[in-house]
Amino acid sequence: MTSVLGVYQYYGMSRISSSDLKPKSELLPWDRPFAGRYSGWATTVSHYSGVLAVAPLALAGYSWYKGDADGHDFGAFTLMFVEAVALQNALNQLVRSSQLWSRPFVYSERGEGRRKAESARGEAYGSFYSGHASAAFTVAVFTGEWFSEIYPNSQYKSLVWASSLTLAAAVGALRVVAGKHYPTDVVVGSLMGTGVSLGILKLHEICKKNIAFWAFPGNIGAIFYF
C-alpha cells in the first residue's frame, strides 16, 4: 500500500513556475554552491549504476550454488531484499512528492542544463532526498550483511563491506556532479537506505526467533514466543 501511494504521489507532482521557485538564498548554505550545476555524462553513468542491484542476489545465488546456503536461505534473503528495495523506493517517492526544493539543474541559466530545466517534469522540483543514494546503500548494506552471515569467518568480509559502501558512495557523488541532487539529499538518502536495510533484516531476525508457523491439510497456525 505504501508503495502504491508513493508512486501515485510521485507521478502526481507538478511543475513549479519560475516565480514560485525557491530562491537560492533559501537553500541550505552548504547546498547553494551546487545550484545550477548539470552534467550529462554523470547523469548517464549514475543511471547505469542500477546494475549494482543484482549484487546481493548474485551473491546469494552463488552461495546457494556452492552449498554454503540452501534454497530456504536464498528465498528468505530474496524476499527481504525485495521488501527493502520496495520500502525505500516508496518512502523516497512520498518524501520527494512534498517538493521541498528543486533539483540543482533547475537553477541552470545557460547551456544544456538550461534546456533540461525548461523541459523538466514535475519530479524535478522534488530533489529531497536522493532515491539513487537510498537504493545504492540499501544494496550495499544487504550485500555486506548477507556475506557476513554466510561467511562469518571469511577474510574477505572487510573487502566486501568496503567495496559495497564505496560503490554506493560513488553513486551518491555522481548524483551531485550530475546536478540531480544536493549533498544534503545524498547524505539523507544514504542514511535512509542504510536504515531500511538494517530495519528489514532486524525485523525478520525477530520474527524468525519469536514466530513459528505450521501448515498441514485442514490446519494452519502460528506460535508467538514472548
Where are these predicted regions, by residue range?
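Juxtamembrane loop-transmembrane helix junctions in multi-pass integral membrane proteins
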Residues: 34-44, 70-73, 123, 152-155
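Alpha-helical transmembrane spans of integral membrane proteins, capturing the lipid-embedded, hydrophobic core
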Residues: 57, 81-89, 165, 190, ...
